[in-house]
A protein has these predicted regions:
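Active-site region of glycoside hydrolase catalytic domains
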Residues: 2-45, 69, 88-90, 98-472
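A common structural microfeature
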Residues: 12-14, 58, 75
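Active-site mouth loops of central-metabolism enzymes
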Residues: 46-59, 134-137
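Internal amphipathic alpha-helical repeat/solenoid segments
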Residues: 57-66, 87, 97
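Catalytic domains of carbohydrate-active enzymes, especially glycoside hydrolases
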Residues: 60-81, 288-292
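Glycine-rich, proline-tolerant flexible connector loops at the mouths of alpha/beta enzymes
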Residues: 80-93
């Protein structure tokens, strides 16, 4: 639909950007922090660094927050490292961890930047993983106790909470994050059992938040991608419906309505993946109500009908070589109408508008975008300049689509792209940069870790100062 005039961004719109603890903080074993599954990895993709130092945000957070304030951030979305708060995942609290995040929150508030806190962003305590991780129901209780500690210590200053970052990616690609035993006979059944436990843990955390912090707001943060059928063939359309139900709506239907959607359940039943559901689980899931939906969007996906020959589940290119098919259910396909970036990701700003509309139409909850950005091989040029016009173009095109979606009637209250500052990519090290701020280091040479404003820094600063009006 076209409009004569687009809606303006509201005055209280939360412009900001995002990071995660293990990708930006460093200080992996300092001040009492315990090891996470990320720290326990014994190998990394060839030519990429580990996460031990990262961007050294732990020691430089004041400098970083000052730069965020200079950009004009209204909000900053970051994650808390579970093992910095409770080193063993359950049990004793680490005072130094409480102190660090308390200081970070205070520093943000000093500049009138709203903290948006992700409670769990891939970095499960390794002590819990060694006991079975999310496969064990005991982690539900451990997560609830961890949540209570966060609410007790930071709830007086944090209004916005995100439960679990990209739970659907942890399930769809479980072997990539160190939370799945690759030797299991039926690893996908185990993943969907882990998923059920995470969903119950999330529901308990949402209920606890509303009980302890009645003025706070909490919601899930999945990765959502619009799914196109590869053609107008009815079989391709059904395949796209299947992919949508399994990849996207399974997680949000559970978070919002406390029920497994029929397509996802039929898929799990057919494949032998249905989880064990204990008495009381569904009541807990139905009782929990998010206040908003946060979601991450980078690209859309395309699906075609299964070929029925066992070849559906195959890597479809891109830098992460993630599998995007399910035998007999759908098959991942390229979209010939979209351009790709250097890492093989299809760029689809209009699909972002459609995604916003579809989520809002389905759930009627306010939306905030908590990741959206462009990874690239940024080059530091003479006079400390980084001319990342490609990032400006990507972010600009996506923000324009937020404005279109708002004119469509979608309630969007914030935008926090990935990432505020260069950090370590989960799969591609520090060479794949996302930030508005350049961190002067290489994969294996820390150099001086100096912070350098990219061209996109100044562009985003102007955009925020105009509350989006400079788009036009």
């Amino acid at each position: 639909m076209n409009y004569n005039k687009l809606a303006a961004f509201p005055e209280n719109f939360l412009w900001g950007a995002s990071t995660s603890a293990y990708q930006v903080e460093g200080a992996w074993n300092e001040d009492g922090k315990g090891p996470s599954v990320i720290d326990a990895r014994d190998s990394y993709p060839e030519g990429t660094t580990d996460f031990k130092v990262a961007s050294d945000h732990y020691h430089r957070y004041k400098e970083d927050v000052a730069l965020f304030a200079e950009m004009g951030f209204k909000a900053y979305r970051f994650s808390i490292a579970w093992t910095r708060i409770i080193p063993g995942g359950d049990g004793d609290i680490n005072p130094k961890g409480i102190e660090f995040y308390s200081n970070l929150i205070d520093e943000l508030l000093k500049y009138k930047i709203e903290p948006i806190v992700t409670m769990y962003h891939f970095d499960l305590p390794n002590a819990l993983q060694e006991k079975g991780g999310w496969s064990k129901r005991s982690v539900i209780d451990a997560f609830e106790r961890y949540s209570k500690v966060l609410f007790e210590h930071f709830g007086d200053r944090v209004k916005y909470w995100l439960t679990i970052n990209e739970q659907n990616m942890m399930i769809l690609h479980g072997s990539a994050l160190g939370t799945l035993d690759p030797n299991l006979k039926n690893p996908k059944k185990e993943l969907y059992q882990q998923n059920h436990h995470m969903l119950v843990a999330q529901a308990k955390a949402m209920n606890l938040c509303h009980e302890m912090l009645p003025e706070a707001k909490i919601g899930p943060a999945p990765n959502i991608a619009l799914i196109y059928p590869a053609s107008s063939k009815p079989e391709d359309v059904v395949a796209a419906f299947n992919y949508n139900a399994i990849r996207n709506w399974l997680y949000l239907d559970m978070a919002v309505h406390g029920r497994y959607n029929t397509t996802a359940w039929a898929y799990m039943k057919e494949k032998g993946y249905t989880p064990v559901i204990e008495d009381g689980d569904m009541e807990i899931l139905r009782s929990a109500k998010p206040d908003f939906i946060a979601f991450n969007y980078y690209t859309s996906q395309t699906a075609e009908a299964s070929r029925g020959d066992g070849s559906d589940e195959a890597a479809r290119g891109g830098d992460q070589h993630l599998k995007t098919g399910e035998d007999g259910v759908y098959r991942g396909s390229a979209n010939p109408n979209l351009e790709k970036n250097d890492f093989g990701w299809e760029i689809d700003p209009v699909g972002f508008r459609s995604t916003l509309r579809e989520i809002y139409d389905r759930y009627q909850l306010p939306l905030i975008i908590t990741e959206n950005g462009l990874g690239a091989f940024d080059q530091l040029e003479e006079n400390d300049t980084v001319n990342d016009d490609y990032r400006i173009d990507y972010v600009k095109q996506h923000i324009e689509q937020i404005q279109w979606a708002m004119t469509d009637g979608v309630d969007v209250f914030g935008y926090s792209p990935w990432s505020a500052i260069d950090l370590i990519s989960t799969h591609q090290g520090c060479s794949k940069r996302y930030g508005f701020i350049y961190v002067n280091r290489d994969e294996f040479d820390l150099k001086d870790l100096r912070r350098i404003r990219k061209k996109s820094f100044y562009w985003y600063k102007e955009l925020i100062a105009s509350n989006g009006a400079s788009l036009n």
